[in-house]
Amino acid sequence: MSHLPILLLLLLVSPGLQAAPTQTTSLKATQVNCSNLREEIVTLLNQPPLPSSNFNNLNREDQRILMKPNLRRPNLEAFQKAVKSLQNATAIESSLKDLPLCLPMATNASMQHPIRIKDGDWNDFRMKLKFYLKTLEIKQPQ
């Protein structure tokens, strides 16, 4: 028997284990467990059919764009737009709608373009979204 459901339940009900709100996160973000949301999206991305999700296949320019703090929201908007062109992606689309609550408010508008995702290409979408989520995990305190 797996203890994962019990652990997840404890994380949801125990206030000491939840992240404290910071100045960079909205109050609504306290209602959304950002770490769990990222993990949920990654779990959905890992469902078959699985592409090779080797981040080394992601070119340096795409990595740079996905790592830029001032492009977090524009990149998320690009993923939200791209998910609409994918089949069987309703669950991911729903989770992406909650993700803006986990991002800091934009400080200044960027003149750079957000990430480009090939229309209808699951492999491209998965690889880039996984990398993007990983950068959020590293950059954002939880």
Curated annotation (Swiss-Prot):
GO biological process: immune response
Alphabetized GO MF terms: cytokine activity; growth factor activity; interleukin-3 receptor binding
Pfam families, per database record: IL3
Position of the signal peptide: 1-18
Tissue distribution: Activated T-cells, mast cells, natural killer cells.
GO terms under cellular component: extracellular space
Matches recorded under SUPFAM superfamilies: 4-helical cytokines
Highest taxon, organism lineage: Eukaryota
Annotated compartments: Secreted
Residues carrying covalently attached carbohydrate according to the record: 33, 88, 108
Key words of the record: Cytokine, Disulfide bond, Glycoprotein, Growth factor, Secreted, Signal
Disulfide bonds, paired cysteine numbers: 34-102
Family: Belongs to the IL-3 family.
Biological function: Granulocyte/macrophage colony-stimulating factors are cytokines that act in hematopoiesis by controlling the production, differentiation, and function of 2 related white cell populations of the blood, the granulocytes and the monocytes-macrophages.
Subunit description: Monomer.
Protein name in UniProt: Interleukin-3
